[in-house]
Amino acid sequence: MPLRRITTLALALSATAATLTALPGAAAARTSETLRWKPCAEEQRQPAETPKDAQDAKGGEGAEVPELPPLECATLDVPLDYADPGGRQIEIAVSRLASEKPERRRGVLLTNPGGPGIGGLGYPAILAASGLPQEVRDAYDLIGFDPRGVGRSTPVSCGLTQEQQDRGNFPTWAHTPGDVVREAEGAREIAERCAASPSAPLLPHIGTADVARDMDRIRAALGEERVSYLGASYGTQLGTAYASLFPGRGDRIVLDSNLGPGGYDHRAMRMLARGLEDRFPDFAAYVAAHPEYGLGTTPRQVRATYQELARRLEREPVQGWDGTSFRGVTFDRLYVDANMPELAKIWQALDTGGPVPEQPPFPDVEPFMSARFAVICDDSPWPRTIREYQRDVRVDSRRYPLLGGSTANIGPCASWPRSWVKEPVRVDDQGPSNVLLVQNERDPGTPLAGAKALRRAFGDRAVLVTADQGGHGVYPFGVNGCANDAVTTYLTTGQRPARDLACAAEPAE
C-alpha cells in the first residue's frame, strides 16, 4: 500500500460537521418500531470500526487490543429523507452492551467515536474494554450505531478510484497559486464522480442533521424519554446537533475533543494546522531530550528538522514517502503520546536513509472516504472559487507553517452539488444546562480554540473542563484523572463542576 495512502487516510480519521437543516425536531421522534436484539457477529464488534487514536490511546502504536465483551445488535428502519417520512426507508445498525446491574441502571448512553465515515457499532465494547469505569457501565446500557451511509447501516459509495482514495482528506501542500489550480482538478473529479454514482440519491441525506434525527429514532425505539450521550471528535458535532435539535430529549451530554459550533466546516479544516502548531512543541521537547535520534537537541532545532525534511522529501521522495505523507504521519502520530518514539524513528529513517518502520495496512477505505466527503460537503457551504483557496493558502502557510499550506488547499466540497448543501443549525444557549465539554489543551485534531468557541455558543448550557495534556481524546482513554473524574461524576451523579475547570497536567503512566 502506498505510504501516502497510509498517512493521508490516517489524517482523514482525525478531526471531525454540523450544518443542519431546519426541519422540525419532533419529526424524528414519530416511530413505534422497537429493536429486536440478537448477538452481534464477531466482525460486528471489531476495533477496526473505531478511530486509530482510540484503539491506541492507552498503549500507542502496536498496543495489544483488549478482549472485547459481547454485544447485541439490531437494525432500525428510518426515513432516507425526513422531509418525506413516508418515503424510502434505510437501515441503521444499532448495538447494545446492557448494564449487568438492573438495580443501578438509570438509562441509556448513546455513543459515537468520531469520523465522519467511521462506524460506531463496536464502540461500546471498545469503551468497556478500555477502561470505562464500572459505575458508568452499571448505570447505563451502552448504545452504539453505524451512522447512515457507513458500515452495516445502509452504505454509500462514490466508486472512487484508487488514486482518489489515496488522496484522503489531506490535500498536497500548495506552494504556488498554480498548485491550487492543479489540486482543484482532482477535487472536482471526486465531486463529479459522487454526483454520478448509484449512491447519488442517498448522498444528499447523510449529513449530520440526518444522523441526529436517526439518534432520536434510536431513543424512541429503545423506549426512552431521554437519552444520555458520549461523543468524541466528530461525535461532538453529532452531540451538539442532537442537543440543539432536541433540547428536551437529551439527559447528560458529554462532548470530548470538540469541534466548534460550525462543525467540520471550512474553518475547521484550516484549524487542523493550528492544532499541529499547538501540539508540536510536546514532540519537539521529547525529541530534543533524546539526542540518539539525531534530529536536534533543542525544540527549535527539531522544528527546523521538520521543515527541512518536508522540503527534501518534496524534491526527492524516499521509500515512497513525500512531503505530504511526512506531514501527514507527523500529524497522525501526535494524537497519542505513546506514539512519539515510533514517529521519531520514522523521522530518523527518512533523514538518514535507513529502513522506515513498517506501517499497518488499512482495510478497504472507499466507503469510508465516500461517506466522509458526503457528510462534510453536505453539512455546510464551502468556498467555491479557486481564488479564495489561493488566498487561504497564502495566509495559512505563514500563520501555521507546519501544515497550513495543505489544510487550506482546495477539496471536493468546492465543487459539491449546490442542491445537496445544507445550512448549519443554530447552536445557542436555549435549552437545559446539561452539556459537559472536555478537552485537551494541545489537541491536534480538534484544537482547544474550537472547544472554547462551542462553550461560548452554548452559554450557560455547558461547562468546559480542560486538561493540560496533549493528544486527541480525553475520556476514558486519556491519562488526566481530574478530567476523567469530572466526566464519570457527571454521568453517574449528574453533578458537573460549578464553573469551567482547568485540570493540571498529569504524567503518563
Model features per residue range: what roles?
Residues 131, 157-169, 243-301, 345-354:
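A catalytic-pocket lid/entrance helix-loop region that shapes and gates access to the active site
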Residues 119, 212-213, 231-243:
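Glycine-rich nucleophile elbow surrounding the catalytic serine of serine-hydrolase chemistry
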Residues 28, 300-433, 479:
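Alpha/beta-hydrolase fold active-site neighborhood
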Residues 436-442:
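Conserved strand-to-loop "acid loop" that flanks and positions the catalytic carboxylate
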